[in-house]
Amino acid sequence: VSSPASAAVSSPGVAPGRQAAQALAALLAQSGTDRAAITQAFNAVAGCSTGLSQDQAIFSNAASSRQTLLGELAALPDRSALPASMLQDLTAAWQASGQADQDFAKWTQDEISQGCSTNDQSDASYQAATAPDDQATKDKKAFAALWAAIADEYGLPLYQYNQI
C-alpha cells in the first residue's frame, strides 16, 4: 500500500524541492480531512450531542492518524530540499495535536461516564488537552507561514493553521 507521500517518489525530471513539496502537500491534505472531523467532534462533545462514543473514536483515530503522518513526514522523499525549520514546526504541531487528541478522547470518555455537562472545561482531561492544543496551534501557525512561500513557488494548495 503506498501512502500519498510515497506516491510522489522519484519522478524523473522533477526537482527534489518540488517533489518533496508535492509529497508534503499530500500529507497536509490527509491531515485536513482529520482536522474537519476533529472540529465537529469537539463541538459535539462541548454541546453534549448524542453519539459521544463516535466522537471519542474520532479523537482516538485522529491521534493514531497523526502518528502515521509523523512517520510519513519523517520518511518524506527529498525532505532535505525543504526548510528544516518548517518541517520541525510541522513535526512539533502533529506531535502536540496527537497528545491533545488523546486527551480530548479521555475528556469525551469522562463526559460519557460522568454525565455530560455543556462546555465542561473543568474536566481534568480537558484541561490536560489545552496545553498541547495551544502549542500545536502555535506550531501550525509557524508552519503555515513558511509553507505559503513553498506552495506559491510550486503551485500547491495553501493551508491555514486551522486546516492542518
Where are these regions (language model features)?
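Eukaryotic intrinsically disordered, low-complexity linkers and tails enriched in Pro/Ser/Thr/Gln/Gly
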Residues: 8-17
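Hydrophobic single-pass membrane-targeting/anchoring helices
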Residues: 1-9
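A glycine-biased, small/acidic residue-tolerant capping/turn segment at secondary-structure junctions
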Residues: 112-115
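Alpha-helical segments in soluble extracytoplasmic regions
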Residues: 19-108, 118-164
